[in-house]
From Swiss-Prot:
This is Uncharacterized protein YbgS. It comes from the Bacteria. Pfam families: YbgS. Keywords: Signal. Residues 1-24 form the signal peptide. Residues 84-105, 117-126 have a biased composition (Basic and acidic residues). Transmembrane segments: none annotated. Residues 27-47 have a biased composition (Low complexity). The keyword Signal applies.
Amino acid sequence: MKMTKLATLFLTATLSLASGAALAADSGAQTNNGQANAAADAGQVAPDARENVAPNNVDNNGVNTGSGGTMLHSDGSSMNNDGMTKDEEHKNTMCKDGRCPDINKKVQTGDGINNDVDTKTDGTTQ
């Protein structure tokens, strides 16, 4: 099948326009709320922004109630590093990151009564 340059140009233009129209139809131009979400992110009132809609069946009176902040221990006290040396603080931070310098000093594998604190996590002592 032999095509002339004009026919090739016409076919290419038709396919380009058709694919562009298909992409525009899929984008959902009528329901696009990107500008509303951007306005809501900037602090403006945007009632049509989906980000401002509360989840279904949520009672806002029960959110963040009680005394104190949300980062408290179960006994209501906050965590501090009072009484820790700089070395202890460093080891504690390293272990929180998963890079404990001496895992046997931080991990208790038994009940702590039978002097099994210095055993490895698999129960061995080597």
